[in-house]
């Protein structure tokens, strides 16, 4: 029995972004019969059109990323879905597939992701889930909700990785100065790279 959840931070009907939802896009799919799963994380704007393929013009101005991870098993997909449901509350594409047998399991976070009407809690939340791919590559999934109120890179990613970070972020305001809230690791928001 397989299922797939297509999610995005934009509303699939009107294309508007809801500010309280996580800036997150992708596909989380799993097969309980074979105990397998994959996670496609991507940054391309807009939901893909149903039944066809097109790359949005809005995605051509900036670089886009796509990363597909074959997960170790379906339980990893369940843990990732639980974090997504709690922290990011993505919009779920109507073309997602959840079998009837699973929709009766209302405590399964993979099914809860389909219940797009559930309001995100106001309790501040950040979470880190270490996991392995099927090929034994180690990953960490880090997430926060809108109520957390701290800087994602300076207060979660840098301290979790115990390292300085050079990041390129989506800028709507002037470039912030380097941050060092833990007095150990510095986060610098880059403007460009010379090769």
Predicted regions located by residue number:
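PLD/PLD-like phosphodiesterase catalytic module centered on the HKD motif
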Residues: 1-195
């Amino acid at each position: 029995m397989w299922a797939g959840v297509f999610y995005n931070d934009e509303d699939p009907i009107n294309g508007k972004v809801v500010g309280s939802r996580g800036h997150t896009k992708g596909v989380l799919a799993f097969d309980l019969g074979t105990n397998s799963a994959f996670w496609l994380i991507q940054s391309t704007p807009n939901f893909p059109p149903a039944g066809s393929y097109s790359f949005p013009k809005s995605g051509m101005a900036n670089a886009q990323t796509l990363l597909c991870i074959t997960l170790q098993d379906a339980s990893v997909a369940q843990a990732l879905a639980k974090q997504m449901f709690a922290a990011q509350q993505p919009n779920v594409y109507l073309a997602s597939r959840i079998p009837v047998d699973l929709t009766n399991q209302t405590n399964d976070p993979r099914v809860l992701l389909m219940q797009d009407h559930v309001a995100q809690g106001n309790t501040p939340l950040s979470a880190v889930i270490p996991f392995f791919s099927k090929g034994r590559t180690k990953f960490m999934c880090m997430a926060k909700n809108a109520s957390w109120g701290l800087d994602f890179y300076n207060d979660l990613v840098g301290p979790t990785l115990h390292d300085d970070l050079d990041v390129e972020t989506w800028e709507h305001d002037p470039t912030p100065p380097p941050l060092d809230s833990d007095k150990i690791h510095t986060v610098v928001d880059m403007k460009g790279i010379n090769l």
